[in-house]
């Protein structure tokens, strides 16, 4: 989407969020944990960050390392929320609750960023056969 803005939230490398609600420890003071990025005219954007650690999920489970993304743009009445998981975290991804639910419908691949060297590529599709899984939060 050419005129979209994507906001990204994530834990630090140790799986700790830089948030007043975080009670598991002190987050890396050199890492903010979020950013907001506009897409260019072709709908592409890029940013530099660290790979987050796994974070606790419901009922004592662990969520695989991921970025949470919120997409807003003209024509989208409510921001869309999704996640990007990492292709090199196969064991953690196999245990993640959201990925497990998406796997039941064969749509888990829409949530996996593909590592290529030091870069992870992730395409977000708003509709169609490859539509990204969006979370109802």
Annotate each predicted stretch with a short phrase.
Residues 1-137:
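Beta-strand-dominated extracellular/periplasmic modules and repeats
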């Amino acid at each position: 989407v050419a005129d979209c803005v994507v906001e990204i939230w994530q834990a630090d490398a140790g799986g700790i969020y830089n948030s007043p609600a975080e009670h598991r420890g002190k987050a890396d003071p050199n890492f903010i944990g979020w950013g907001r990025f506009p897409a260019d005219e072709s709908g592409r954007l890029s940013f530099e960050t660290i790979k987050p650690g796994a974070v606790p999920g419901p009922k004592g489970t662990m969520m695989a390392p991921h970025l949470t993304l919120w997409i807003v743009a003209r024509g989208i009445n409510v921001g869309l929320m999704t996640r990007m998981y990492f292709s090199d975290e196969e064991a953690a991804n196999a245990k993640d609750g959201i990925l497990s639910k998406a796997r039941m419908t064969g749509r888990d691949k829409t949530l996996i960023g593909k590592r290529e060297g030091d870069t992870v590529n992730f395409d977000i599709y708003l509709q169609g056969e490859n539509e990204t899984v969006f979370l109802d939060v």
